[in-house]
Amino acid sequence: MLNSNKFKSKTGAYGDLFQRVVVHSLVLTFLVLLLYSSLFPLTSFALGFITATCGAVGTYEYSSMAKAKMHYPLSTFSAIGSFLFLALSFLSIRWGHSLPGFFDALPWTLLIVWVVWSIFRVRKSTIGALQLSGVTLFSILYVGIPIRLFLHVLYSFIHTQEPYLGIWWASFLIATTKGADIFGYFFGKAFGNKKIAPQISPNKTVVGFVAGCLGATLISFIFFLQIPTRFASYFPMPAILIPLGLALGITGFFGDIIESIFKRDAHLKNSNKLKAVGGMLDTLDSLLLSTPIAYLFLLITQSKEFIG
């Protein structure tokens, strides 16, 4: 009987692994096609819609955690606010050169109005105005700001001589961050025994963390070797990509840990129940912390060309 249970456990683990590989491979293929066509008008609007939708779903999932914890009543309201914030952000970042100057302020104006409106929208809420406004604001910013910064990384080189440089940087950011996730998952599953934070994220192991760091370093080294010749002038110190990739892998790990803390506080295993994925936050969590690091790096090192 014991052997039978072990067999079922292993079979279930392999089935889950197979589903993860299939789902993430399909998502990755779609993402690559979308990224590398993101400078064309039609596909750029598709990307804008998809990123705004992802942000809205992520915000809804975070708000649902708050609902489970403290009966937060505005999950859908916050998700709509996140969608509008990111849709306006996309328009101002991608098409700002052809829009009136005041358009850059619209996303932030909407955010302020949305938070104030949330206070008056639920007058009899059991959690109070301070908590209500705080959860509404944070639920939008937690997901919305990193996605907005990702759009900056992708499109801020569009008016330079090398508009595809933004796509290169976006690819580097995703590859190193999610590569660390993948290396950490597989090696942690195969060889990991010692847990890093068993009370927060039981599946995170020391072996997985080290493997993730090595994976991010390896991927950044590959990018370093394959820098296109036409981009060379933008990389006065190209070797800095290697420690940057490591930093993105490490911050991505802590982004994952932060989301796990939120889930444990709400007594949830996954942020949602998408097959083989968990939820939008479970997919984006590592990028939510690594994206601001990549943005700051570009803002400092590419200040002449990068329109942050």
UniProtKB/Swiss-Prot annotation:
Annotated keywords: Cell membrane, Lipid biosynthesis, Lipid metabolism, Membrane, Nucleotidyltransferase, Phospholipid biosynthesis, Phospholipid metabolism, Transferase, Transmembrane, Transmembrane helix
Report the subcellular localization: Cell membrane
* Chief place of localization: membrane
EC numbers for this chain: 2.7.7.41
Q: Which Pfam families match?
A: CTP_transf_1 (PF01148)
Write down the superkingdom of origin. Answer: Bacteria
The protein's topology relative to the membrane is: Multi-pass membrane protein
Q: Which GO terms describe its molecular function?
A: phosphatidate cytidylyltransferase activity
The metabolic or biological pathway listed in the UniProt record of this protein is: Phospholipid metabolism; CDP-diacylglycerol biosynthesis; CDP-diacylglycerol from sn-glycerol 3-phosphate: step 3/3
One GO BP on record is: CDP-diacylglycerol biosynthetic process
Which GO cellular component does the record give, naming just one?
plasma membrane
Catalytic reaction equation(s): a 1,2-diacyl-sn-glycero-3-phosphate + CTP + H(+) = a CDP-1,2-diacyl-sn-glycerol + diphosphate
Enzyme category, top tier? transferase
TM region positions: 30-50, 73-93, 100-120, 127-147, 167-187, 205-225, 235-255, 280-300
**Family membership:** Belongs to the CDS family.
Q: Which PANTHER family match?
A: PHOSPHATIDATE CYTIDYLYLTRANSFERASE
UniProt-recorded name of the protein: Phosphatidate cytidylyltransferase
According to its UniProt entry, this protein's organism is Chlamydia pneumoniae (Chlamydophila pneumoniae)
